[in-house]
């Protein structure tokens, strides 16, 4: 594959494997080496913490004054009911909040399909169990659903609402993110003759309110918008006095210990008086293999660590070592 060494490969959406109704695997490739983890970790954090969604935030149950109680004729205690309500997968169209009502009587399970709501609300998991009634008992409740982002504990809202909140209105920890679980894996990828590329595989489980491909698109948009400020730095007027460009990349002036090699590899380099990264990159593979006790495994480790920093063996450095290091060598 021909091209400038400064050109980066751009990933493309390769495959979406729908494992089940709420889980999918999204594969993106090719990525430059190291970018699998860079992008995978950034997208994972955004998908978990920053995706907008809807969640239950408040509940009022007839005959219940606080969450540390129980209701006659209901198998579950109030805390269990609140926990089950957190599992509702809901979407709201055209507004930021909605009030749902639930009234049920007679023995049996109370499910999400028993909830009454207007046309702007969709309950994605209607079979979700909220509680169980025994005998000829009933239960009535009002459920507030709001649109938000991230995770907002009930205690955070309680501090600002305690004075105005009526007795019996129970606050619920709100997890607005539609992504329930996210994990990523980086595998090897190949493009023509290049075999040192990354393939990013994102394994995502949602609550069913968002399509996995749309979730990836939204998270990437959020990341791009946050990085726009850094892109605009190029348009800032440069100062009249430009700093003198250093003769060598600062990373070359750092000690070999900063590479965090294994003890065996580090000791072999020290035995050859290789103290700085600039000393190391000028050596060739053949020269290093002649080093006592340094085998192919150690050589591979050294090459991988250098590659992760954009360096390689066999580089030519004019005027090395610099005067600042000459006295130490």
Curated annotation (Swiss-Prot):
Region (Alpha C-terminal domain (alpha-CTD)): 248-329
Known function: DNA-dependent RNA polymerase catalyzes the transcription of DNA into RNA using the four ribonucleoside triphosphates as substrates.
Cystine residue pairs: none
Family of this protein: Belongs to the RNA polymerase alpha chain family.
UniProt keyword annotations, A-Z: DNA-directed RNA polymerase, Nucleotidyltransferase, Transcription, Transferase
UniProt keyword Transcription present: yes
Protein name according to UniProt: DNA-directed RNA polymerase subunit alpha
Keyword Transcription among UniProt keywords: yes
Primary gene name: rpoA
Organism of provenance: Shewanella sp. (strain W3-18-1)
Subunit relationships: Homodimer. The RNAP catalytic core consists of 2 alpha, 1 beta, 1 beta' and 1 omega subunit. When a sigma factor is associated with the core the holoenzyme is formed, which can initiate transcription.
GO terms of biological process kind: DNA-templated transcription
InterPro entries attached to this UniProt entry: DNA-dir_RNA_pol_insert, DNA-dir_RNA_pol_RpoA/D/Rpb3, DNA-dir_RpoA, RBP11-like, RNAP_asu_C, RNApol_insert_sf
Protein EC: 2.7.7.6
């Amino acid at each position: 594959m021909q091209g400038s060494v400064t050109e980066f490969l751009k990933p493309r959406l390769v495959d979406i494997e729908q494992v089940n109704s709420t889980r999918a695997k999204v594969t993106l490739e090719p990525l430059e080496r190291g970018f699998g983890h860079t992008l995978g970790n950034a997208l994972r954090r955004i998908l978990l913490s920053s995706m907008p969604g809807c969640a239950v935030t408040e509940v009022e149950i007839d005959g219940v004054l606080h969450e540390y109680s129980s209701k006659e004729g209901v198998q579950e205690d109030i805390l269990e009911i609140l926990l089950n309500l957190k599992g509702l997968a809901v979407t709201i169209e055209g507004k930021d909040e909605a009030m749902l009502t639930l009234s049920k009587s007679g023995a049996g399970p109370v499910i999400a399909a028993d909830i009454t709501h207007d046309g702007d609300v969709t309950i994605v998991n209607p079979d979700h169990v909220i509680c169980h009634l025994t005998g000829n008992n009933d239960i009535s409740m009002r459920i507030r659903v709001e649109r938000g982002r991230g995770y907002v504990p009930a205690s955070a809202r309680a501090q600002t609402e305690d004075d105005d909140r009526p007795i019996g209105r129970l606050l619920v920890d709100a997890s607005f993110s539609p992504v329930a679980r996210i994990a990523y894996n980086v595998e090897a990828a190949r493009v023509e003759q290049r075999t040192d590329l990354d393939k990013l595989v994102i394994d995502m489980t949602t609550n069913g309110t968002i399509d996995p491909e749309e979730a990836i698109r939204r998270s990437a948009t959020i990341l791009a918008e946050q990085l726009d400020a850094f892109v605009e730095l190029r348009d800032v007027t440069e100062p009249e006095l430009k700093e003198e460009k250093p003769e060598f990349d600062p990373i070359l002036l750092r000690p070999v210990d900063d590479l965090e090699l294994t003890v065996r590899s580090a000791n072999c380099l020290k035995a050859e008086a290789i103290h700085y990264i600039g000393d190391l990159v000028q050596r060739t593979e053949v020269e290093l293999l002649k080093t006592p006790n340094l085998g192919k495994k150690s050589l591979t480790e050294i090459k991988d660590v250098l590659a992760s920093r954009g360096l390689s063996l066999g580089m030519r450095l004019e005027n090395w070592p610099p005067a600042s290091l000459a006295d130490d060598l």
